[in-house]
Amino acid sequence: MNQNFYSMIDRYKHQQLRIGPVSPQQISAWANKILPNGEVVGEVTKPYTFHYKTNKPEKDGLFCERIFGPIKSGICACGNYRVIGAEKEDPKFCEQCGVEFVDSRVRRYQMGYIKLACPVTHVWYLKRLPSYIANLLDKPLKELEGLVYCDFSFARPIAKKPTFLRLRGSFEYEIQSWKYSIPLFFTTQGFETFRNREISTGAGAIREQLADLDLRIITDNSLIEWKELGDEGSTGNEWEDRKIRRRKDFLVRRMELAKHFIRTNVEPEWMVLCLLPVLPPELRPIIQIDGGKLMSSDINELYRRVIYRNNTLTDLLTTSRSTPGELVMCQEKLVQEAVDTLLDNGIRGQPMRDGHNKVYKSFSDVIEGKEGRFRETLLGKRVDYSGRSVIVVGPSLSLHQCGLPREIAIELFQTFVIRGLIRQHVASNIGIAKSKIREKEPIVWEILQEVMQGHPVLLNRAPTLHRLGIQAFQPILVEGRAICLHPLVCKGFNADFDGDQMAVHVPLSLEAQAEARLLMFSHMNLLSPAIGDPISVPTQDMLIGLYVLTIGNPRGICANRYNFFNCKNDENAPLDNDNYQATKEKEPHFSSSYDALGAYRRKRIRLDSPLWLRWRLDQRVIIGSREVPLEVQYESFGTYHEIYRHYLIVRSVKKEICSIYIRTTVGHISFYREIEEAIQGFYRAYSYAS
């Protein structure tokens, strides 16, 4: 691999990959290599693969050993063998066939290129929505497509020179369209001279317009127009207002695209190809199966189609002098369509098929989707220190915790447990430690608990479409074989508990653990990175639970028309369905929330049973209230009780407030205590941070 490619991969000692347009010089630098005799190879000029008699790669073909390296390590096309890396004065390549004596693995990354006879537009940047080329040129996509596929031409502005196109105004009528009539007047060379002088068509016209763009001027002009449209305000016409909004959205996209090109040092004309890269042979193999038959990648056939058409166009432009110009335009269109099919088959309509009516897999089909090169081969590989299981709800977990089954945890942290067993002199070597783990001795689980306390794990749910698709958690040992997850983090993962699976990974290096703790913990990712809205919000089951918890008894206070102090409530008598009808009117009173929760745990009251709870309420709130009591009950000792809708006041003979009771339920008490603990915990954390 050449030094330029190495510098891209190994920059700053980190492996990185950037996908985007590249210059023709960069493509040439990736593909070209200089042999020890000074010859430069890298261009693929022939559409052949292997010779049908010798089964050897054709020279300058799609599997040429001079361009891509030897098929067998250290063996050239002639059959000579040299020891790889031997420091001798012998040349490192065969002087007869020009093949270098290198490792055959070079065929996995050594690229080639096809020198196109005419510029070709990259179909990804033309046809994919939004069209980058149409955005930058500010022209309709249909107009650009007609220009690319030679359906019409642009006239070049030539000042103070007689032009053939000015004759168009001399005719009163036209028998044919000028698109078809102009090429009929010229031979090949004459048409090329005319086209280069007066008209512009094909991808070359797109390339010229992109090369003339100034991205900074585009950004400034788009911003000025956007501000002018914003200052105009509403016109009162719904159709016109919609057109203005669409235009403003287009200007924003255009500015963002231009800024991205400036930031990444990409020139707009690179979206039009002059050199077509050829993939390494090992990525598009030809395999021989039983019976001597060959199986080839579809990309090889698409490359052959491009080379055939490109060579035909080259012959028309260089050798033939009497070919009509119309034929040249038609051949350029065929080259453009062949490259489109190679890059993205079917993007322009009907896909290309083979003799068995099977659609060819283009480059886009190979890399995109769930079974593509990235998601299946590169990102979907199994890795060490990872596991996978179904997720279930863990309502008792904290937001930053996850429940890890014992079977998964002991496998993930086995090396750490072995080290702990040896350090504590429980086992003398690795073999004994593994046997203790297999026997599941109690000391194993104790050491596993210690290891897991300071080691976060990463949970990932595919597809990982944004950064919240993988988050860090503190693992907790649980029984069973399913991973327990807090329900509040499901929205970030786009997960639910209907059979979804998640993968668990163990960060090993200190850098990875620090990143997990500082950036990836679930309780530190409460907001959506896209729009900033809260993403850890109660949904579905949690909302239903909160509703049931706080619904209370709908009968209201008017159902109780007696002094609650006269009700004798046996604290030890459990409440069942049989005697509930007889006792449900008796609303008990409690001096603290702990007593109320204790009575609920003893099944003395229900979750929604109304009760009176003594409460420390600011008397100024009571005095300032203008609410009239629903009922006043007097005691024999002179004290009396003012019963309001939601609270009750006990006053002395001197009308002083002795105590205040509020009417609530166990559900409200539980909910209040949870909120109170959360606020206090937040306050303590904030005070500690300050």
From Swiss-Prot:
Co-factor(s): Mg(2+); Zn(2+)
Q: Which Pfam families match?
A: RNA_pol_Rpb1_1, RNA_pol_Rpb1_2
Q: Which SMART domains does the annotation name?
A: RPOLA_N (SM00663)
* GO biological process entries: DNA-templated transcription
Q: Does the keyword Magnesium apply?
A: yes
UniProt keyword list: Chloroplast, DNA-directed RNA polymerase, Magnesium, Metal-binding, Nucleotidyltransferase, Plastid, Transcription, Transferase, Zinc
**Which reactions fall under this protein's catalytic activity?**
RNA(n) + a ribonucleoside 5'-triphosphate = RNA(n+1) + diphosphate
Tell me how the cofactor is bound: Binds 1 Mg(2+) ion per subunit. Binds 1 Zn(2+) ion per subunit.
E.C. number(s) listed in UniProt: 2.7.7.6
Keyword Chloroplast among record annotations: yes
Q: Name one GO cellular component term.
A: DNA-directed RNA polymerase complex
| GO MF annotations in UniProt | DNA binding; DNA-directed RNA polymerase activity; magnesium ion binding; zinc ion binding
Compartments, as annotated in UniProt = Plastid, Chloroplast
Where is Mg(2+) bound in this sequence?
496, 498, 500
**Binding, Zn(2+):** 76, 78, 94, 97
Known role? DNA-dependent RNA polymerase catalyzes the transcription of DNA into RNA using the four ribonucleoside triphosphates as substrates.
Q: What is stated as this protein's family in its record?
A: Belongs to the RNA polymerase beta' chain family. RpoC1 subfamily.
User: Could you describe the subunit structure of this protein?
Assistant: In plastids the minimal PEP RNA polymerase catalytic core is composed of four subunits: alpha, beta, beta', and beta''. When a (nuclear-encoded) sigma factor is associated with the core the holoenzyme is formed, which can initiate transcription.
Q: What is this protein called?
A: DNA-directed RNA polymerase subunit beta'
The gene from which this protein is expressed is rpoC1
